């Protein structure tokens, strides 16, 4: 009996000492701060709680630019994350980095996880799909440009809070009334190149670059110095001189000035909705991107923004299985609908859009379907999207040149001509470096 007792004690001790089956860790680098950072952390927590085999570890790596730079360095050093969030302007660069990535379609197939590219919203999935039809990255947080406005400020200025300006001339008139009522920042904009050049072009069915805006080849060249583009930037420059448009900086710097109530109107990401809902102390509204009513074919559709998730090469098979399971979890209609409603990002799948509509969310939150309506319209060769090499550098050039207009140092034509010339130098450089692919 004593021997049996000793044997049992030894067995129990061994069981306690033996490590539990270790979870497979999946590193996810992202660029989401604030409320969106909390959302990302919640997504990982929910997935981790739903099963015990894998553990997704999200890590904030700074801005999209900083995260991409860090990931390139990490890949070269052999310690890249499994998943990297890359903004849409980095798509062509990632596509050219064949050895550094594994197409998401391939990851899902090898893991034996059901994956139907047709289940995703076409305008979103299409942007991240190769010419051969293979989806290259997971369309995680896709947004588009919309018009946000402060309904309380509209009331104070004698404007109808339920009738936002739909055209650029109407924006100028509303801005003048807001200024007259004492508002020091009637209108601003975030992501200037995206909102005022890229989306502006698609919305007016006007070419931004040749080769279908780069979607049909890396030998594309910029064309956004057309008379329509010059007219628009000239109008914004004149609004800046009159104090009707106040430039608040690059990237999403203007977002905070709208949420705080400092600026009354802004063009920016549909994903600003989550921040507004959480932090704004005023009633806000969402409307479509303004357009020029005399331009034939306008409004057309807006282009995609936000980012997708790329799977990095050089990982183990069981780790890729974890990545596939995580993507499958994010694609569940109820999960994707929850994310869309919380953030203002576009619904990931058709099913999540239908679920959101059926729940009455759009009726209860007027304007939240604007981004979807702008994106589901049939696209043209000029409006399908923009996919250019060295796009990050091109956007920086556009920021620099447009800042010269806002400061009154260059005319709109000078600035756009210079932006196109400098941007085309970047495209030529990218083409030379990647001449093996079309």
Task: Indicate residue ranges for each PLM-predicted region.
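Extracytoplasmic "Venus flytrap"/periplasmic binding protein-like
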Residues: 46-120, 156-158, 163-166, 257, ...
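Glycine-centered hinge/linker elements that transmit conformational signals in sensory
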Residues: 172-178, 217-248
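Long, aromatic- and glycine/proline-rich binding clefts that accommodate carbohydrate-like moieties
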Residues: 119-120, 341-400, 404, 432-438
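Short, solvent-exposed loop/beta-turn-alpha elements that line the ligand-binding surface or hinge
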Residues: 105-120, 164, 206-231, 278-279, ...
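Extracytoplasmic/periplasmic substrate-recognition and gating elements
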Residues: 77, 133, 157, 230, ...
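A structural signal for short loop-to-beta-strand junctions that line the ligand-binding cleft
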Residues: 73, 81-82, 113-154, 185, ...
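Extracytoplasmic/periplasmic solute-binding protein
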Residues: 129-140, 145, 155, 169-221, ...
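Hinge/lid segment of periplasmic solute-binding proteins
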Residues: 87-146, 172, 198-202, 228, ...
């Amino acid at each position: 009996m004593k021997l049996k007792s000793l044997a049992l004690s030894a067995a129990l001790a061994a069981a306690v000492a033996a490590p539990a089956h270790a979870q497979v860790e999946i590193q996810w680098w992202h660029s989401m701060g604030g409320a969106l950072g909390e959302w990302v952390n919640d997504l990982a927590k929910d997935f981790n709680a739903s099963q015990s085999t894998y553990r997704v570890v999200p890590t904030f790596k700074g801005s999209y630019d900083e995260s991409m730079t860090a990931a390139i360095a990490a890949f070269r050093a052999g310690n890249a994350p499994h998943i990297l969030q890359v903004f849409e302007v980095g798509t062509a660069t990632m596509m050219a980095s064949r050895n550094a990535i594994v197409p998401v379609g391939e990851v899902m197939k090898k893991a034996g996880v059901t994956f139907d590219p047709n289940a995703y919203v076409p305008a979103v999935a299409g942007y991240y799909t190769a010419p051969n039809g293979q989806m290259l990255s997971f369309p995680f947080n896709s947004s588009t440009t919309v018009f946000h406005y402060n309904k309380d400020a509209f009331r104070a200025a004698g404007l109808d809070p339920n009738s936002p300006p739909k055209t650029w001339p109407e924006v100028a008139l509303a801005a003048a009334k807001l200024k007259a009522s004492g508002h020091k920042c009637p209108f601003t904009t975030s992501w200037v190149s995206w909102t005022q050049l890229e989306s502006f072009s698609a919305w007016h069915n006007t070419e931004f670059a040749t080769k279908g805006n780069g979607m049909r080849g890396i030998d594309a060249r910029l064309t956004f110095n057309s008379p329509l583009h010059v007219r628009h930037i000239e109008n914004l420059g004149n609004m800046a001189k009159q104090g009707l448009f106040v430039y608040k900086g690059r990237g999403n710097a203007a977002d905070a000035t709208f949420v705080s109530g400092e600026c009354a109107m802004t063009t920016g990401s549909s994903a600003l909705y989550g921040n507004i809902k959480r932090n704004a102390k005023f009633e806000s509204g969402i409307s479509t991107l303004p357009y020029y009513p005399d331009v034939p074919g306008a409004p057309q559709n807006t282009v995609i923004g936000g980012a997708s998730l790329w799977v990095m090469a050089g990982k183990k098979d069981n780790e890729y299985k974890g990545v596939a399971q995580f993507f499958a979890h994010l694609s569940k209609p109820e999960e994707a609908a929850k994310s869309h409603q919380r953030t203002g990002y576009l619904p990931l799948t058709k099913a999540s859009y239908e679920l959101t509509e059926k729940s009455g969310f759009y009726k209860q939150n007027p304007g939240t379907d604007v981004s979807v309506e702008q994106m589901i319209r049939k696209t043209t060769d000029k409006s399908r999207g923009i996919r250019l090499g060295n796009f990050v550098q091109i956007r920086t050039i556009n920021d620099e040149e447009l800042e010269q207009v806002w400061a009154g140092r260059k005319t709109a034509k000078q600035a756009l001509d210079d932006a196109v010339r400098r941007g085309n130098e970047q495209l030529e450089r990218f083409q030379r470096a990647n001449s093996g692919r079309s």
